C-alpha cells in the first residue's frame, strides 16, 4: 500500500496503548465485512435523517473502530469528518479521507465547540467502568459540540441478541472459560 492510501492518523497516545484485546478485535472483524457494515450504517443514518443535514456539517465519530461509519458518511456526501478510536490496528484499516485520532474517547483531543454532530455507533458499552467513564465521555462530547449541536448515539445494550449474550457471559462457568466475555458481544 502506498503512503497516499494510508489513513492520516494523529496520535494523542502511544501506538501500543489500546483498549481492546486482540480476541475482541478479531471477533468484531469477523462479525460483518466492512462493506456490510457500511451499508448498515448508511441505512441507519438515512433512517435518522442524516440526508437532511448540511453536507458541510462538521462531524466527529467517536469509537469509530475501522472507520466504516466515516465511510458511510463520506458516501452520503459529508466532507468534514474526523474519527477517534483507541485501537491503532482498527484505525489503520480505514480507507477514506477523514482525519483519524488515536486517542481515548474519555479525553477527546478535539476542538471545543467545533462540531455540529458527534456520532457513536456501538462504542459506549465498551467503556470499562460505568457510570464514571460514561460521565467522562459525555462531558467530552458536550465540550466539543457546538451549542446547538447534535449527539447521535446508537447502542446495542437492549437488543435481544445482546441480552442473551450478557446472560451467557455472566455465568460463572463461562467466566472461568473466558474471563473477557465482551469479545462475545
Predicted regions and their residues:
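A short His-aromatic
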Residues: 125-130
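Conserved class I S-adenosyl-L-methionine
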Residues: 1-54, 56-65, 152-178
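A short acidic, Gly/Pro-enriched loop at the edge of an enzyme's catalytic core
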Residues: 106-118
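A short glycine-rich, Lys/Arg-flanked "PGG" loop and its adjoining helix->strand segment in the class I
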Residues: 135-147
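A short beta-strand submotif of the Rossmann-like class I SAM-dependent methyltransferase core
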Residues: 120-124
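Class I SAM-dependent methyltransferase SAM/SAH-binding core
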Residues: 66-107
Amino acid at each position: 500500500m502506498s503512503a497516499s492510501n494510508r489513513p492520516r492518523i494523529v496520535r494523542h497516545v502511544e501506538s501500543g496503548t489500546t483498549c481492546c484485546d486482540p480476541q475482541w478485535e478479531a471477533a468484531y472483524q469477523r462479525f460483518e465485512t466492512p462493506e456490510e457494515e457500511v451499508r448498515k450504517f448508511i441505512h441507519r443514518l438515512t433512517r435518522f435523517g442524516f440526508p437532511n443535514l448540511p453536507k458541510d456539517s462538521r462531524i466527529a465519530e467517536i469509537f469509530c473502530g475501522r472507520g466504516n461509519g466515516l465511510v458511510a458518511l463520506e458516501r452520503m456526501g459529508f466532507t468534514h469528518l474526523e474519527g477517534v478510536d483507541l485501537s491503532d490496528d482498527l484505525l489503520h484499516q480505514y480507507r477514506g479521507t477523514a482525519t483519524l485520532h488515536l486517542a481515548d474517547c474519555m479525553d477527546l483531543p478535539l476542538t471545543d465547540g467545533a462540531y455540529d454532530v458527534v456520532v457513536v455507533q456501538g462504542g459506549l458499552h465498551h467503556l470499562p467502568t460505568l457510570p464514571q467513564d460514561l460521565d467522562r465521555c459525555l462531558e467530552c462530547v458536550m465540550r466539543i459540540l457546538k451549542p446547538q449541536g447534535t449527539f447521535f448515539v446508537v447502542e446495542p445494550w437492549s437488543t435481544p441478541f445482546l441480552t442473551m449474550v450478557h446472560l451467557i457471559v455472566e455465568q460463572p462457568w463461562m467466566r472461568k472459560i473466558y474471563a473477557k466475555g465482551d469479545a462475545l458481544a
